[in-house]
Amino acid sequence: MQRAAFKVALSAIAVAAAFASTAHAAGFMLTEQSAGALGRAYAGAGVDGTDLSGVYYNPATMVLHKGTAIQMGFVGIGLNLDYVGEDGTTANGRNKSQAIPHGYIVHQINDKVWFGLGMTVPFGMGTEYDDDWAGDEHGISATILTFDLNPNFAFKLSEKFSVGVGASIQYASADLKIRKNITEQVQTAVNGIQPGAGDAITDASVRSEIDADSIAWGWNVGMMWSPLENLRLGVSYRSKITHDAEGDLSIDELSVTPGSIGPLDLTQIIGTNLTENGLYGDMTGAATVTAPAWAMASVAWDVNDLVSLYGTFRWTDWSSFDELKIDGDGKNVSTIPNKWRDTYLGSLGMDLRLTDWWTLRGGIAYESSPIANPQYRTAIIPDADRWWFAFGSSFKWSDNFQTDVSFAHLHGVHERNIYNDKGAKEGRFRKLDAYLLGVQMVYKF
């Protein structure tokens, strides 16, 4: 009962916060946990000290903040997934624009210990096509949502060195809709009723939809070293979190070509074979979704009172997301192979402090795609290598109050084709772009 109530509470918080349903970072990872750091393409994230997002990126950097402070903000996202098939048909997997919320609290307990709490949406995605679009066997729609509650402690070991550690309680929900080819199974079912009749069937498919959720745990750790007063180096790590999600699975809308098979109708086919073998009907669904581990190294150099330079390198363990397996009533219904590889992000950025209250920033980043073999690219996660181009600004209205606004354009490059299960090219994404707008406020008590 307590677990169910907690799931409802976390779900309500995430929905009320206008959860993200857009995939744009590599895989379905959401880098966007700070609207301020977005303005420099997340270069220096965690060690920059300009906001409280170090709670997420590197908890050791909480020692940069005195007293108590809070931060709230969001990053709004719009997609352009422009697809054209080999036959000239077009589609666009853009979902309605959504917002990724984030919130942080940092409190200095004493001269050596800090406490921080992060509320983030670290993984999420959402793509949606028409039910009858040409690539429906690659996916019709998909939404993955995570909400992460992350308490942390930081310890200042010396004037130059600090460490941080935290735990994550993470709620995840997944809704996946896909049309699955079951031609061989239907041929077998029909031949079992009327021998030889199934040989005339050239195509058969059903629509599968699973809606499942889960709660799981993880941990994170970080370190920061300041060899010089104006130079900070940080490394951090977040563990993978495996969600064994359970919920409802519905398989319906059987489509058979040709539609007429002698004296047989679809009702006979469904009732005789498909339902008994877990290929049709409503059942208990289960899916395993892995939020991968990642490690990050960042540097911040305050060159002078006017300029600060930043850099970040991040590795993400996407090779752990080898396949997406969906079960119904304990039987495997579908397995979607991913064969993903680890990804890397490198970014460089700069802050320019024009006045005591106005700072401009900009950054550029390159991020690799987890898709090792383009034949495993799906329309629901149509990933590709991408460039980030970002700029932003901070406004310090008083010693206690600051606002940040940032914009970024993510542009997908290189191979963007879609293939069928026989290895033939079905089409390509002419554009894989995302547009991000972030706004946040920081208040110090």
Describe each region flagged by the PLM.
Residues 1-24:
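Gram-negative bacterial Sec-dependent N-terminal signal peptides
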Residues 10, 31, 35-38, 50, ...:
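N-terminal amphipathic/basic helix or basic patch
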Residues 24-41, 45, 87-90, 97-445:
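Outer-membrane beta-barrel porins/channels
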Residues 29-44, 63-80:
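Transmembrane beta-strand segments of Gram-negative outer membrane beta-barrel proteins
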Residues 46, 51-56, 60-62:
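Periplasmic N-terminal accessory/gating domains of Gram-negative outer-membrane beta-barrel systems
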Residues 72-99:
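Mid-chain, structured segments of secreted extracytoplasmic proteins
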